[in-house]
Amino acid sequence: MSENTKQSPGTSCSVDQQRPVFYVIAILLPFVLLLILEGLLRISGFGKEYPLFVPSNYSQDYLQPNPEVVKRFFHQAKFAPPVGPDTFLFRKNKDPDSIRIVLMGGSTAAGFPYGRFGSPAGMLNQRIKAQFPDSHVEIISVAMASINSYALLDFVDEVIEIEPDAVLIYAGHNEYLGVMGVGSVYASNGSHAANLLFLKLKDWRIFQLIQSIYYALFQTPVDVDHSDGSRTVMASVAKEKAIAFDSALFTEGSAQFEQNLMAIQSALSIAKVPLYLSTIASNEMDLPPFSSSSNPDVEQLIDRAKPRSNRRIIQQGVTLLERGDTSADLAYAVAQAMLDESDERAADFFTLAKDYDLLRFRAPSSFN
C-alpha cells in the first residue's frame, strides 16, 4: 500500500516566496549574457569606435576633431567617403575666461570650395576676436561634406562634453543626399525610427558582430567610386536623382530634418548651451536647375532653338505653373524673363525653380 506524502504549509510558503526571485533571474539572465559577450568582444579588440574628438598629435593637452569620424556610420570603413572635419586644436580642459563656439554642418559650413578660412568658422573667428580682443576665442568646426542632420544629432552629446558657450548650426543642403539621407547611396533601408536606433546601437560590439555576419552571408555593401577627382563627394553619393517636390521622399527628408533639429535643440537646452540656427543660402539666380521634369508645352515654350519673347514666356509660363506644373526649367526660364523685364517677382520664381529641382543638392526654401 502506497503512502501519500503531504507538503507542509511551511515548505509551500517558502517555494512561493522564491518564485519572484526565479522570475527576476530568468528575465535578467539573457541581458547578463549579452553584457558578458559585449565585454569579451571589446577585450578581444573586435570592432571599433570613432569618437568625435581625439587627442592632438602635437600635445596631449589639446583635442581636435577626428578626421576619420565619418567612418562611424559605415560597417566597413573603406566604404566611407573620403571626408573629415578640418583640424581645429583646442584645450582639453577649457580655460574659464575663454569663448568656445562649435560650428556644426555640412560642406558649406566646412567652407567648400574655399577652405577653412573662407568658412563660417574662419569668418566668425575674426569677428569675435575683433569684438572681444582680450578674450581667448576658440571656434571649433565639426562640419564636413556629405553629412546631414543625422550626423549632427549623433555628434551633439560629444559636443556638449567639451563645454561650448554656444553652438552654431548651418545645415540643410545635404539633407536628402548626405549620409543616411533618403536620396543617398548610403541611405538606410529603414524608417526614421530605424535610423535613430542604428545611431544608438552602432558602437555596440554585438551589433557590429551581427552586421559582419549579415553582410558576409546576405549582402555586399554599396561600393562607391571616389577616385574621380572631377566629381564632388556629393555627386558621387547621389542615388535618387529625381526627388519630386512634395513627393513621399521629399516629405520624408523634410520631416527627418525637422525632427532631428528638434532633438538637437532639446539636448542642448537640457545642457543649457545656447543654439544659433542659421538660415541657409544658395545661388538661385546663376545656377540653373540640375534636373527637371518636362512636358511638350514646357519644351515648346522654352525651346532655345525657337526663342520666345520675355512677355510670352512670363504670361504662358506663370499660367502653366499656376495650373500645377512643377518643371524647374520652366520656373527658371520665367524668372530669367522677369529679371530681364525688371519684374520684382523674379526672386520668387528663382526660388521656385530651386524647389522644383529634382536633384536635391540645394535645400528647399521650406527649410528656412
Language-model features: locations:
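N-terminal Lys/Arg-rich, disordered targeting/topogenic segments
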Residues: M1-R19
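Hydrophobic membrane-insertion alpha-helices, especially the h-region
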Residues: I25-L40
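Membrane/wall-proximal cationic-aromatic binding patches
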Residues: G47-F132
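Loop/turn elements at helix/coil->beta-strand transitions in domains of secreted/extracellular proteins
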Residues: S98-R100, D134-E138, I162-V167, S269-Y276
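Second-shell loop/turn segments in exported
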Residues: S107-G115, S141-V142, S247-S254
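Serine-dependent acyl-ester chemistry module
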Residues: G118, H173-N368
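Structural motif
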Residues: I139, A145-V156
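Short, well-structured alpha-helical segments in soluble
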Residues: L152-A166
